[in-house]
A protein has these predicted regions:
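Polyanion-binding surface elements
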Residues: 1-29
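A detector of low-complexity, intrinsically disordered, Ser/Thr/Gly/Pro/Ala-rich segments
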Residues: 22-23, 42, 57
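Residue-level detection of the helix-turn-helix DNA-binding "recognition helix"
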Residues: 31-32, 56
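Short Lys/Arg-enriched helix C-cap and helix-to-coil transition segments
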Residues: 38-44
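A short, Lys/Arg-enriched interface patch at domain edges and termini
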Residues: 51-63
């Protein structure tokens, strides 16, 4: 069952696509303490709102 609501968390692959980087590079970022990634079982997910804040912090802009 799919919801029309925006997902709160996305896969590392989806994050890579949004950031315009390779999947292996996204997994490297996911291992960093300052990157908004977390684990659910064996899956690594990225907090969508946290990702936007992280990008803003990296570019020196406020969200």
């Amino acid at each position: 069952m799919k919801e029309d609501k925006e997902k709160l968390a996305i896969s590392v692959r989806e994050a890579a696509e949004l950031l315009g980087i390779s999947v292996p590079t996204a997994y490297e970022l996911a291992r960093r303490a300052d990157f908004p990634a977390f684990h659910v079982g064996r899956r690594t997910l990225v907090d969508r709102a946290g990702l936007a804040s992280w990008v803003s912090a990296q570019t020196g802009r406020k969200s």
